[in-house]
Amino acid sequence: KTAYEIRNCDWSSDVCSSDLTLLAGVAGRVPRVELGTAVLLPALRNPVILAHLVATLDQVSEGRFIMGVGIAADVPNIRAEFEAAGVPFEKRVGRMMEGLRLCKAFWTGDPVNWDGRWKVEDSVLGPTPHRPGGPPIWGGGSAEASLTRAGKHFDGWFPTGPDAAGWGKQWKTVCEAAEAAGRAGAVTGAVYLTVSIDDDAAKADGMINDYLENYYGQPAEIIRRRQACFAGPEAEFTPWLKGYVDAGASHLMVRVVGDHESHIAILAKARDALN
């Protein structure tokens, strides 16, 4: 059954449940599909604990977890989250990258000694991930530094936009960075999209604006400069998605705003048309 049918569950886009805990539950009920975070903020986590949580989730899902990570957009709600966690917002890039390196060290199963932001002495993680070395890590972000970082260090690139043409140009930069690092072809191209499908385009547009402002605590017009959104009729939706596929995206993640049941049927048709 869907969350809508059960009626005592929330859609993941409606509330911010604990990501890895929620995915562990989904992994136990859904045996085939890939699962991922969009995106997890490693800078907010202790990497020793994060490495253990992710390894456990990868075991529960039998290797179906994709670890989407990011440094977080500079918006009021996210700054407030960092402040509440006692983590300096301006240090988030360094914390993320070092934290991920420490996670990967633990995922080898070998004893770990670490002397950096975190101190670790002769420690071993158990269980290790289902996949040797850990799950694939996809990096979000569209800034120039994020593109280079994805090409040099990550297994996938996972931004929230911009439009298909802009995504294609940025994807070229990611691929060039990967090639320069000796990693040609090692990065998966993905994109995270927000959609509201309705014959009344103005209504759909307003729903997206309301959702974004509530979620991020910032005017929608600012958020939409860096996040790709579709608001309009079904007939225009698949061609819009196809623009990203033609630009090189192999994975399309869709955040739905509006009636989820009707959107699921439309997404299924779009998937079949694009395959």
Segments and roles (model prediction):
Residues 30-35, 60-65, 108-112, 130-136, ...:
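Short, well-ordered coil/turn segments that N-cap beta-strands
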Residues 118-125, 141-145:
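Active-site glycine-rich loop that binds ribose-phosphate moieties when present
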Residues 1-15:
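Single conserved hydrophobic/aromatic residue that forms the stacking wall/gate
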Residues 58, 66-68, 77, 87-88, ...:
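C-terminal amphipathic alpha-helical "assembly" element
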